[in-house]
Amino acid sequence: LLGTKLLMAGHNVTLVCRKNTAELINRGGTEVRIKLRDEATHRAIFSRDLPGSLDAAAPADVEISRYDLVGLAMQEPQYTNHAIEVLMIRIAEARLPCLSIMNMPPLPYLRRIAALAEADLDEAYTNAAVWERFEPGLVTLCSPDPQAFRPPEEAANVLHVGLPTNFKAATFADAKHNALLRELEADIDAVRLDGLDVPVKLKVFDSLFVPLAKWSMLLTGNYRCITPHEPQSIRDAVHGDIRQSQAIYDHVDAIARKLGADAADQWPFAK
């Protein structure tokens, strides 16, 4: 989804995926289905119709020197795959800025928070060694992420956007990298489709704590979808006991404030 927004803004994107998926994307491109404001049905946006160029590659085939920015878009345990781990070493050595849309904040990002800089956090990660070469100031995080999924009946190059919210990114440590981030923000904001605004923007914030608004949402909703018996929807997880849900949400918000967040960085439970 983020790649498609960048393509719509005229930037070039490489998706790193399994070999078979890379071959599929290089052959047929991608399709992202998204609903525009006040429209009843989703529109299909095909990469082949966009001004930016898209290709895909397996981890071993990525040529690092081609890129200005890396997007980290997998679940945290997946970074322990050997081919991915080798690619991550190359990214860290190249000192490329990394924009994460992971649910689990990358360890170098948490090191940017003064209260966590010296904390022993390794056990929270499947393999913390994946992150040890990264300079903290080169890693930033987005929140809250739009909700999107691959329809199970479709090929792996199709994505359906269910909740078209914005990517809210904290800044990097380097002004040069922030200039790139704000350029992408402006370019994405300017995109129109048949004269209409396209949802899912990239918004840049100075506070490191804006992305941590995700914690309260995930722990109140998504992470309570798995029960001892059967899965439940996010709606049921939250509304099944609204008082308990608000208590969880407020508790996690309080932890973020204890780490240094301002209430203005957070997202009210009622919304």
What are these regions (language model features)?
Residues L1-I34, L107:
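NAD(P)+-binding Rossmann beta1-loop-alpha1 motif at the extreme N-terminus of oxidoreductases
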Residues N20, H82, A175, A179, ...:
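Conserved active-site and cofactor/substrate-binding residues in soluble primary-metabolism enzymes
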Residues T30-D55, D122-Y125:
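N-terminal glycine-rich dinucleotide-binding loop that anchors FAD/FMN and/or NAD(P) in oxidoreductases
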Residues R43-S100:
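Rossmann-like NAD(P)-binding element
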Residues S65, A94, L99-S216, T220-G221:
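Rossmann-fold dinucleotide-binding core
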Residues N166, I226-G240:
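Short, flexible active-site loops
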Residues L180-G195, Q244-D265:
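Flavin-binding catalytic cores
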Residues L208-P228, Y249, D253-K271:
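C-terminal substrate-binding/catalytic lobe of Rossmann-fold NAD(P)-dependent oxidoreductases
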